[in-house]
């Protein structure tokens, strides 16, 4: 069902960032060029799993959750919202400090309110740093997270997020880097 995605991940180059094995893929990095068949395959699989009548917005996390959320928004006809890396100073803006395996930065949530029903999407869960703080802040705001979808699960990131947030995370592909090569298998 996710043959194009899995095959493209298995062919992804791997680079070392300190002690961190980082795979480079169009879904997670925007390079190499992402075959639109892969993005379409992802959006179709995700759209099949959403109860469209209950969702107010598709929410993606900048940067690499944007194209996934956009494709899903186009596939479902649901409005798109992006959790940004830039502060706007709008009324009701929420700032989040996030720590990942390779960086510390801030994210900003706007235009989400108590009672909003959302589907949250992102590209990769690896250390759980981004997704954990985003989910916990959304819950603190009172947003109802109906589903959380992540395209790639690397290492123990999914379990870390589930333990820290109490939310169920649905991942499409389980990936690891073994001896400098990507090993990937579909979970759907």
Curated annotation (Swiss-Prot):
Q: Which GO terms describe its molecular function?
A: guanine phosphoribosyltransferase activity; hypoxanthine phosphoribosyltransferase activity
What EC designation does it have? 2.4.2.8
Q: Where is the protein situated, by its record's location annotation? A: Cytoplasm
Name its pathway: Purine metabolism; IMP biosynthesis via salvage pathway; IMP from hypoxanthine: step 1/1
Instruction: Indicate the secretion signal residues.
Output: none
Q: What is its main location?
A: cytoplasm
Fetch the PROSITE patterns from UniProt: PUR_PYR_PR_TRANSFER (PS00103)
Keyword Cytoplasm, does the record have it? Answer: yes
Q: Which Pfam families match?
A: Pribosyltran
Q: Which reaction does it catalyse?
A: IMP + diphosphate = hypoxanthine + 5-phospho-alpha-D-ribose 1-diphosphate; GMP + diphosphate = guanine + 5-phospho-alpha-D-ribose 1-diphosphate
Q: Kind of enzyme, top EC level?
A: transferase
Superkingdom classification of source: Archaea
One cellular-component annotation, GO: cytoplasm
Q: How does it assemble?
A: Homodimer.
Q: Which family does it belong to?
A: Belongs to the purine/pyrimidine phosphoribosyltransferase family. Archaeal HPRT subfamily.
Relate the protein's function as given in its record: Catalyzes a salvage reaction resulting in the formation of IMP that is energically less costly than de novo synthesis.
Q: Supply the name of the protein.
A: Hypoxanthine/guanine phosphoribosyltransferase
Upper classification of the organism: Archaea, Methanobacteriati, Methanobacteriota, Methanomada group, Methanobacteria
């Amino acid at each position: 069902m996710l043959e194009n995605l899995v095959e493209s991940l298995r062919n992804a180059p791997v680079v070392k960032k300190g002690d961190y094995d980082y795979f480079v893929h169009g879904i997670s990095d925007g390079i190499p060029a992402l075959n639109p068949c892969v993005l379409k395959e992802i959006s179709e699989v995700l759209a099949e799993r959403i109860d469209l009548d209950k969702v107010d917005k598709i929410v993606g996390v900048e940067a690499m959750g944007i194209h996934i959320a956009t494709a899903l928004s186009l596939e479902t006809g649901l409005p798109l919202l992006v959790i940004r890396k830039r502060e706007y100073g709008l009324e009701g803006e929420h700032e989040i400090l996030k720590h990942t395996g390779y960086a510390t930065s801030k994210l900003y949530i706007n235009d989400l309110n108590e009672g909003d029903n959302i589907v949250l999407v992102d590209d990769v869960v690896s250390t759980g740093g981004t997704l954990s703080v985003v989910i916990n802040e959304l819950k603190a705001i009172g947003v109802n997270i109906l589903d959380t979808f992540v395209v790639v699960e690397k290492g123990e990131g999914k379990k870390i997020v589930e333990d820290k947030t109490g939310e169920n995370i649905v991942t499409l592909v389980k990936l690891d880097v073994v001896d400098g090569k990507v090993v990937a298998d579909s979970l759907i």
